Amino acid sequence: MRKHSSITLLCLALLAGFVFLQAKASFATVGNRIVGAIATSSRVPLRANVSPLAMQAKDLGPAAANTRLPWITLSFQMTPAQQSALSQLLLEQQEPGSPMYHQWLTPEQFAAQFGVSPHDSAAVASWLTQQGFTINAISRGGQWISFAGTAAQVRQAFGTEIHTVQLNGETHLANLTAPSIPSALASMVSSIQGLHDFRPRPRNIVRRVSPEYTSSTSGNHYLAPGDFYTIYDVNPLLSSGINGTGITIAVMGQVDLNLSDVATFRTASGLPANVPTVKLYGTDPGAPSFKAGAPTTGDVDEAQLDVEWAGAVAPNASILFVNSTAAFTSLTNAIDNNLAPIISISYGDCETNFGSSINSYNQLLEQAAAQGQTVVAPSGDSGATDCDGGTNAQGSPIATATNGLAVDFPASSPYVTGVGGTTLTEGSVNYWNTANGANSGSAKSYIPETVWDDTSSTNGLSASGGGVSVAFAKPTWQTGTGVPNDYSRDVPDVALAASPNHDGYLICSENYNTGPLSIVDAGPSCQNGYRTSGSGALTVVGGTSASTPSFAGILALVMQKTGAKLGNADPVIYALANGNHYNNVFHDVTVGSNSSPCTMGSIGCPSGGSIGYGAGIGYDLATGWGSVDAFNLANLWTSVSVTNLGAQLPSTTTVTASPVSSTQGATITFTAAVAPASGTGTPTGTVQFLVNGSEVGAPVPLSNGTAVFATSSVPAGDQTVTAFYSGDSTYGTSKADASITVISATNPDFSISPLSGTLTAASPGQSTAAFPLTFTSTNGLAGTLTLTVNSSVNEYNPSFSNATFNAAANTWSLPIAANGTATAALTIGTVHPLIVQGSSTSSRLAVPDRGLPGKRRGLGGLGGTIAGGGMALAALWMIALPRRRRLWTPLLAFALLAALGFSAGCGNNAGGARLAPNPGTSTGSFPVVVTATISSGSTTITHSTNLTLVVQ
């Protein structure tokens, strides 16, 4: 253990005492969860605390021991009782008849009821300091502690090593194995952030164009503030003095802001001077560069866009730019310090990429709602497939989805207003004047809108994000015409113009020229109106991160009009949509979709084509309720009453089907079991069963916590069965899913058995036991099944017995006879370290094998020591194989190693080559999808089984 001077220990004691004295009275109701000393001898792992991006990256080896991690955050979780009390408070704060209506909390008041105790906070701070870390900040809301330290200190305290990794040409720092914490902290720590420097990407699309921004000759139009005022009916508010005066909008950033560009934008737009305030937390992120974790040019454009347009829609509002090395660090501090009543964050990612930190951030967003803060976020720019998009390793736009339907967080949080995107669609009507007027506007009136969808092979996936959350249940206020009966949080809530092509937003932003070795500032923009100083081009942006700060500006006008904080805006938005004012407040978008082209056989895309959601009457999963009329929104905001259900304790639901594979028309029985998430008790209420999102039968009352339903009306195909528990006066809602296969009663078909199961590897480097899969032909189906394997695990080596591997396609072939069965046993090998003598660092060896695109595969089950220069070169040869190389049989690798003397201790270590370490397979639980496809005449038949790989 590191020794400390008496001065250090004295300072620590004073810090702990200060925290205690400051909060003693208000924290009296919070119990201690840490009993006794925090010992490192007994530890528990924190699952889902490895970045999926790190798992896809090339490992360059351990980072230097003194590598500094400037902002690590240990997040705490509430007890079930605290969560129930907070849920109740949030409901009461939105009910006009409640004594808690709009009684917003301070951070200290939040901590007093929902944070950890001062004793526990001080104990954790003390333990961190003993490990050598420096405390950055202790959450005012009792939700987290931030600290800084080195890679060596992280390894000592959390049992995980920080590595240097490379992804898409960028170098990053990341942990590649799950961190662990002392058992004494297990009940209160939910996640650790800051062990990697993968930064969230902005949701903007930038194009620089040279035509005039309004041209009767070219027909090109771009949005200036004056156009926005006309299209979304902001002008009547501004003319009556509702312009944002007295309201602060906090904009989240992760790059230095150029204040001169903000000033020139306001001049070009005819807006009064209004200099933003900058608040920095932690290390200054600086300007764009190619250094690890540094800002990008996209961050610059995002910062300028958000500040300029939030301040354009609410021209007299105070704009606070909250800056740090990561936008979610900025968000954390904006909430914990209660910096502003309205928060705009234009950064996000698909839900599954957050791992366990999604729960920590959602709890933080609950704190924001309790404090009366309104948070708005983009719904994403990859259509209904948010886990796809961006660019591939070659820098080309990704235009085909492979990861299935997904939504963006934080927009998917029930405590955030998610903003989608539309395209202005004039048709044959002339909605534009030939010359610009006030605030550079030329739009004549509201312009009809369709779903934003610019997806193409050139643009890549480029459409309004939206869909169904896999992380959050449907909040009680999310109801109304068009809202799906999916029992999940649906996204988005509203939408505004977002297409950069028709018609994009004008901004002023530094024009950066990028090259292979450097990024050079080519000069400021907007030197001649909105034109850049160099080529005279216009900087035009789009994406849902353009609609987001604009909607934040509208909400600032609403807040000034109502004279009160809004808190979570969604309950009122949905109340307005369900009242008599829908057509006054919203512009319903009924044309278009956010569907994404998808690869046949990939997740959620068994037959190819596209997946996504279309627009419709009322609410839809592409644009929410549509765009808004700002004037009517502000004037009618207080005209509705929000009614909510009471808060309950968390519940858990499980569902099973019997049989899991049957013939169409046969009876299948669904059984749901509901229990408290913790403690004892017997939930009452009902369970609604659904098949592929459609209700089957009426809700079934629980009997001793169990509901049973039988049906013979399930259609043929792979189906998802959902059981949704309604909740009761004590327990909240919950849901669960199960997979079944129903084969045709008359047409050629086949089934897979089992449809679920678990493969377990005792440790990284071990193989799973063979898991037999049986394929059964019906109605004369015969031919060859094509098998594929997909998983999110970073290093794995699947193989099938009785099936022939096709190296060119990364698939397996399995013959099946008419009305017969075929069996193939799946084995998954995992990767562990192979030590190379002659190197000062233990190294890990991974050989690309049966690689699916973008996934590294390891040579599982190898053990031993490679010694001598020749053996090291052989290992280097294997590591150098391209990651996307077709399959190399493991026998070739074994043969080469044997020829060079693969054994423990053979050869000598003189001149041994150092290998780039490889992380091997991460521990944890990972989904594995096995898909089987066969053609029957002109029909392609596909079935899948959903398995789980557990690496212990």
Question: What is each model feature region?
Answer:
Residues 79-80, 151-152, 255-258, 423-426, ...:
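Acidic glycine-/aspartate-rich tracts in secreted/extracellular proteins
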